[in-house]
A protein has these predicted regions:
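Extracellular-loop-to-transmembrane junctions of the mid-late helices
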Residues: 5-19, 118-154, 191, 197
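Hydrophobic alpha-helical transmembrane segments of multi-pass membrane proteins
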Residues: 13-34, 38-63, 69-86, 105-123, ...
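Alpha-helical transmembrane segments in multipass membrane proteins, preferentially the mid-helix core
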Residues: 25-27, 83-87, 147-166
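Membrane-interface helix-boundary motifs at transmembrane edges
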Residues: 30-43, 89-101, 162-173
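Non-cytosolic membrane-interface motifs at loop->transmembrane helix junctions
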Residues: 65-74, 131-138, 199-203
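Signal-transducing coiled-coil linker helices
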Residues: 161-225, 232-241, 248
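Hydrophobic/aromatic micro-motifs used in signal-transmission helices and low-complexity FG repeats
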Residues: 225-226, 256-258, 266
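Conserved long alpha-helical elements within nucleotide-processing catalytic cores of c-di-GMP signaling
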Residues: 231-250, 260-277
Protein backbone atom coordinates (compact mmCIF):
# COMPACT_ATOMS: atom_id res chain seq x y z
CA UNK A 1 0.00 0.00 0.00
CA UNK A 2 2.83 2.38 0.88
CA UNK A 3 4.57 1.56 -2.41
CA UNK A 4 1.34 2.27 -4.36
CA UNK A 5 0.93 5.67 -2.69
CA UNK A 6 4.58 6.46 -3.39
CA UNK A 7 4.17 5.54 -7.07
CA UNK A 8 1.06 7.74 -7.27
CA UNK A 9 3.01 10.71 -5.92
CA UNK A 10 5.76 10.17 -8.51
CA UNK A 11 3.19 9.88 -11.31
CA UNK A 12 1.37 13.04 -10.21
CA UNK A 13 4.67 14.92 -9.95
CA UNK A 14 5.62 13.90 -13.49
CA UNK A 15 2.21 15.00 -14.83
CA UNK A 16 2.38 18.36 -13.09
CA UNK A 17 5.93 19.12 -14.17
CA UNK A 18 5.14 18.18 -17.79
CA UNK A 19 2.27 20.66 -17.65
CA UNK A 20 4.58 23.28 -16.11
CA UNK A 21 7.08 22.66 -18.94
CA UNK A 22 4.31 23.20 -21.51
CA UNK A 23 3.37 26.47 -19.82
CA UNK A 24 6.99 27.66 -19.72
CA UNK A 25 7.44 26.93 -23.43
CA UNK A 26 4.22 28.79 -24.27
CA UNK A 27 5.28 31.68 -22.07
CA UNK A 28 8.69 31.91 -23.76
CA UNK A 29 7.17 31.73 -27.25
CA UNK A 30 4.62 34.40 -26.32
CA UNK A 31 7.31 36.67 -24.87
CA UNK A 32 9.25 36.45 -28.16
CA UNK A 33 6.15 36.79 -30.35
CA UNK A 34 4.97 39.84 -32.30
CA UNK A 35 1.49 40.01 -30.76
CA UNK A 36 0.14 43.20 -29.19
CA UNK A 37 1.64 44.15 -25.82
CA UNK A 38 -1.75 44.02 -24.08
CA UNK A 39 -2.45 40.52 -25.42
CA UNK A 40 1.07 39.39 -24.58
CA UNK A 41 0.84 40.69 -21.00
CA UNK A 42 -2.56 39.09 -20.35
CA UNK A 43 -1.47 35.72 -21.78
CA UNK A 44 1.77 35.73 -19.77
CA UNK A 45 -0.33 36.44 -16.67
CA UNK A 46 -2.41 33.35 -17.48
CA UNK A 47 0.73 31.23 -17.86
CA UNK A 48 2.31 32.51 -14.62
CA UNK A 49 -0.83 32.00 -12.51
CA UNK A 50 -1.37 28.48 -13.85
CA UNK A 51 2.23 27.52 -13.04
CA UNK A 52 1.69 28.72 -9.46
CA UNK A 53 -1.53 26.73 -9.26
CA UNK A 54 0.09 23.55 -10.59
CA UNK A 55 2.97 23.79 -8.12
CA UNK A 56 0.71 24.54 -5.16
CA UNK A 57 -1.74 21.77 -6.04
CA UNK A 58 1.09 19.26 -6.39
CA UNK A 59 2.37 20.06 -2.90
CA UNK A 60 -1.21 19.99 -1.58
CA UNK A 61 -1.85 16.49 -2.95
CA UNK A 62 1.11 15.16 -0.97
CA UNK A 63 0.02 17.09 2.16
CA UNK A 64 -3.76 16.78 2.05
CA UNK A 65 -4.15 17.49 5.76
CA UNK A 66 -2.50 20.93 5.46
CA UNK A 67 -5.28 23.52 5.54
CA UNK A 68 -3.05 26.37 4.34
CA UNK A 69 -1.98 24.51 1.18
CA UNK A 70 -5.61 23.71 0.40
CA UNK A 71 -6.50 27.38 0.84
CA UNK A 72 -3.69 28.46 -1.48
CA UNK A 73 -4.76 25.89 -4.08
CA UNK A 74 -8.29 27.32 -4.01
CA UNK A 75 -6.95 30.87 -4.26
CA UNK A 76 -4.78 30.16 -7.31
CA UNK A 77 -7.68 28.33 -8.95
CA UNK A 78 -9.77 31.50 -8.60
CA UNK A 79 -6.91 33.54 -10.04
CA UNK A 80 -6.71 31.11 -12.98
CA UNK A 81 -10.37 31.64 -13.87
CA UNK A 82 -10.04 35.42 -13.51
CA UNK A 83 -6.83 35.59 -15.56
CA UNK A 84 -8.49 33.75 -18.43
CA UNK A 85 -11.53 36.02 -18.25
CA UNK A 86 -9.19 39.01 -18.45
CA UNK A 87 -7.40 37.44 -21.43
CA UNK A 88 -10.72 36.90 -23.24
CA UNK A 89 -11.64 40.55 -22.71
CA UNK A 90 -8.24 41.60 -24.05
CA UNK A 91 -8.59 39.43 -27.16
CA UNK A 92 -12.10 40.77 -27.76
CA UNK A 93 -10.71 44.31 -27.28
CA UNK A 94 -13.19 45.04 -24.49
CA UNK A 95 -11.98 47.83 -22.22
CA UNK A 96 -13.63 48.79 -18.95
CA UNK A 97 -13.43 52.58 -18.78
CA UNK A 98 -15.56 53.08 -15.68
CA UNK A 99 -14.38 51.91 -12.26
CA UNK A 100 -17.79 50.38 -11.59
CA UNK A 101 -17.34 48.04 -14.57
CA UNK A 102 -13.96 46.92 -13.26
CA UNK A 103 -15.42 46.39 -9.79
CA UNK A 104 -18.27 44.27 -11.16
CA UNK A 105 -15.77 42.12 -13.06
CA UNK A 106 -13.79 41.60 -9.82
CA UNK A 107 -16.81 40.63 -7.67
CA UNK A 108 -16.47 36.82 -8.13
CA UNK A 109 -12.76 36.98 -7.26
CA UNK A 110 -13.40 39.22 -4.23
CA UNK A 111 -16.17 36.90 -2.96
CA UNK A 112 -13.86 33.90 -3.40
CA UNK A 113 -11.11 35.58 -1.36
CA UNK A 114 -13.57 36.53 1.40
CA UNK A 115 -14.87 32.96 1.60
CA UNK A 116 -11.31 31.62 1.79
CA UNK A 117 -10.46 34.05 4.60
CA UNK A 118 -13.55 32.99 6.56
CA UNK A 119 -13.06 29.27 5.94
CA UNK A 120 -10.41 28.59 8.66
CA UNK A 121 -12.83 30.02 11.24
CA UNK A 122 -15.98 28.06 10.45
CA UNK A 123 -15.25 25.70 7.53
CA UNK A 124 -17.86 27.26 5.26
CA UNK A 125 -15.98 26.06 2.15
CA UNK A 126 -14.28 22.87 3.30
CA UNK A 127 -12.53 21.22 6.21
CA UNK A 128 -10.04 18.41 6.74
CA UNK A 129 -11.17 15.75 9.21
CA UNK A 130 -8.97 13.68 11.51
CA UNK A 131 -8.51 11.04 8.80
CA UNK A 132 -7.16 13.68 6.38
CA UNK A 133 -10.33 13.47 4.28
CA UNK A 134 -11.62 16.51 2.41
CA UNK A 135 -15.16 17.48 3.42
CA UNK A 136 -17.20 20.06 1.55
CA UNK A 137 -18.70 22.96 3.48
CA UNK A 138 -22.13 24.60 3.01
CA UNK A 139 -20.72 27.31 0.70
CA UNK A 140 -18.53 25.01 -1.42
CA UNK A 141 -20.94 24.86 -4.37
CA UNK A 142 -21.31 28.65 -4.22
CA UNK A 143 -17.54 28.97 -4.57
CA UNK A 144 -17.56 26.66 -7.60
CA UNK A 145 -20.42 28.59 -9.22
CA UNK A 146 -18.97 32.08 -8.79
CA UNK A 147 -15.68 30.96 -10.34
CA UNK A 148 -17.52 29.28 -13.21
CA UNK A 149 -19.15 32.66 -13.86
CA UNK A 150 -15.88 33.83 -15.43
CA UNK A 151 -16.02 30.91 -17.86
CA UNK A 152 -19.74 31.39 -18.56
CA UNK A 153 -19.51 35.14 -19.16
CA UNK A 154 -16.29 34.75 -21.17
CA UNK A 155 -17.86 32.10 -23.42
CA UNK A 156 -21.00 34.22 -23.85
CA UNK A 157 -19.04 37.35 -24.79
CA UNK A 158 -16.89 35.39 -27.25
CA UNK A 159 -20.06 33.99 -28.87
CA UNK A 160 -21.69 37.44 -29.12
CA UNK A 161 -18.57 39.00 -30.62
CA UNK A 162 -18.17 36.12 -33.08
CA UNK A 163 -21.65 36.89 -34.38
CA UNK A 164 -20.61 40.54 -34.84
CA UNK A 165 -17.21 39.71 -36.34
CA UNK A 166 -16.12 41.79 -39.31
CA UNK A 167 -14.60 38.86 -41.21
CA UNK A 168 -14.40 35.08 -41.18
CA UNK A 169 -10.93 34.99 -39.65
CA UNK A 170 -11.97 37.12 -36.69
CA UNK A 171 -15.16 35.10 -36.29
CA UNK A 172 -13.18 31.85 -36.14
CA UNK A 173 -10.73 33.27 -33.57
CA UNK A 174 -13.59 34.34 -31.28
CA UNK A 175 -15.27 30.96 -31.67
CA UNK A 176 -12.05 29.22 -30.62
CA UNK A 177 -11.92 31.33 -27.46
CA UNK A 178 -15.59 30.69 -26.69
CA UNK A 179 -15.26 26.93 -27.11
CA UNK A 180 -12.17 26.94 -24.90
CA UNK A 181 -14.00 28.73 -22.08
CA UNK A 182 -16.86 26.21 -22.25
CA UNK A 183 -14.40 23.29 -22.18
CA UNK A 184 -12.54 24.79 -19.22
CA UNK A 185 -15.79 25.09 -17.26
CA UNK A 186 -16.42 21.37 -17.80
CA UNK A 187 -12.83 20.50 -16.84
CA UNK A 188 -13.04 22.66 -13.71
CA UNK A 189 -16.31 20.98 -12.69
CA UNK A 190 -14.77 17.52 -13.14
CA UNK A 191 -11.81 18.62 -10.99
CA UNK A 192 -14.22 19.62 -8.21
CA UNK A 193 -15.77 16.14 -8.35
CA UNK A 194 -12.50 14.18 -8.57
CA UNK A 195 -10.22 16.28 -6.38
CA UNK A 196 -7.39 13.74 -6.12
CA UNK A 197 -6.97 13.44 -9.91
CA UNK A 198 -5.05 16.18 -11.80
CA UNK A 199 -7.84 16.74 -14.35
CA UNK A 200 -7.65 20.53 -14.37
CA UNK A 201 -3.87 20.50 -14.72
CA UNK A 202 -3.86 18.29 -17.82
CA UNK A 203 -7.07 19.70 -19.29
CA UNK A 204 -6.09 23.35 -19.05
CA UNK A 205 -2.54 22.74 -20.34
CA UNK A 206 -3.75 20.90 -23.44
CA UNK A 207 -6.54 23.43 -24.01
CA UNK A 208 -4.19 26.41 -23.74
CA UNK A 209 -1.74 24.71 -26.10
CA UNK A 210 -4.50 24.05 -28.66
CA UNK A 211 -5.81 27.62 -28.38
CA UNK A 212 -2.30 29.04 -28.79
CA UNK A 213 -1.59 26.95 -31.90
CA UNK A 214 -5.02 27.71 -33.40
CA UNK A 215 -4.65 31.46 -32.91
CA UNK A 216 -1.10 31.40 -34.28
CA UNK A 217 -2.34 29.62 -37.41
CA UNK A 218 -4.89 32.39 -37.89
CA UNK A 219 -2.04 34.92 -37.97
CA UNK A 220 -0.12 33.15 -40.75
CA UNK A 221 -0.80 34.85 -44.09
CA UNK A 222 2.05 33.49 -46.27
CA UNK A 223 2.14 29.99 -47.74
CA UNK A 224 5.48 28.40 -46.65
CA UNK A 225 5.99 26.63 -50.00
CA UNK A 226 5.08 29.22 -52.61
CA UNK A 227 5.63 32.33 -50.44
CA UNK A 228 2.32 33.60 -51.83
CA UNK A 229 -0.65 34.95 -49.89
CA UNK A 230 -2.76 32.14 -48.44
CA UNK A 231 -6.49 31.89 -47.70
CA UNK A 232 -6.23 33.97 -44.52
CA UNK A 233 -4.64 36.84 -46.41
CA UNK A 234 -7.21 36.54 -49.22
CA UNK A 235 -10.07 36.84 -46.72
CA UNK A 236 -8.48 39.90 -45.13
CA UNK A 237 -7.93 41.53 -48.54
CA UNK A 238 -11.48 40.77 -49.73
CA UNK A 239 -12.90 42.24 -46.55
CA UNK A 240 -10.90 45.45 -47.01
CA UNK A 241 -12.06 45.69 -50.64
CA UNK A 242 -15.71 45.13 -49.78
CA UNK A 243 -15.61 47.90 -47.20
CA UNK A 244 -15.14 50.37 -50.07
CA UNK A 245 -18.55 50.28 -51.76
CA UNK A 246 -17.57 52.80 -54.47
CA UNK A 247 -14.83 50.66 -56.02
CA UNK A 248 -15.44 47.81 -58.46
CA UNK A 249 -14.02 44.46 -57.41
CA UNK A 250 -13.25 41.51 -59.65
CA UNK A 251 -12.30 38.03 -58.46
CA UNK A 252 -10.41 35.72 -60.81
CA UNK A 253 -10.39 32.05 -59.82
CA UNK A 254 -8.13 29.59 -61.65
CA UNK A 255 -8.93 25.88 -61.46
CA UNK A 256 -6.18 23.49 -62.57
CA UNK A 257 -7.57 20.10 -63.59
CA UNK A 258 -5.78 16.89 -62.64
CA UNK A 259 -2.99 18.73 -60.83
CA UNK A 260 -2.63 15.78 -58.46
CA UNK A 261 -1.55 13.68 -61.45
CA UNK A 262 1.83 15.45 -61.40
CA UNK A 263 2.46 14.20 -57.87
CA UNK A 264 1.32 10.68 -58.73
CA UNK A 265 3.46 10.32 -61.88
CA UNK A 266 6.52 12.51 -61.18
CA UNK A 267 6.67 12.69 -57.38
CA UNK A 268 5.90 15.35 -54.79
CA UNK A 269 9.13 17.27 -55.48
CA UNK A 270 8.09 17.95 -59.08
CA UNK A 271 4.58 18.73 -57.93
CA UNK A 272 5.94 21.38 -55.56
CA UNK A 273 8.03 22.91 -58.36
CA UNK A 274 4.98 23.04 -60.62
CA UNK A 275 2.94 24.65 -57.86
CA UNK A 276 5.61 27.30 -57.25
CA UNK A 277 5.82 28.02 -60.98
Amino acid sequence: MVKWVYMNEILFAEIYYICVAIMLILGFKTYRSMMKNSQKASFLAVVFVHILYFQTDLVRMSNVQNLFLNEMSFLFFSLCTFSWFNYILTMLEIQYVKKTQTLIALIPLIVSVVLLLMNPLNGILFKIDQNANFQEGPFYLLYVFINDLYYLVGAYKAYVYSCRAKNYQQKKSYQILGIYMAVMMIVGTLQDIFRQVPIFCVGTSLSILIVYISLEEQMISIDPLTQLNNRNRMEQHLFECMRNADANMYLLVLDVNRFKKINDEHGHAQGDLALKA
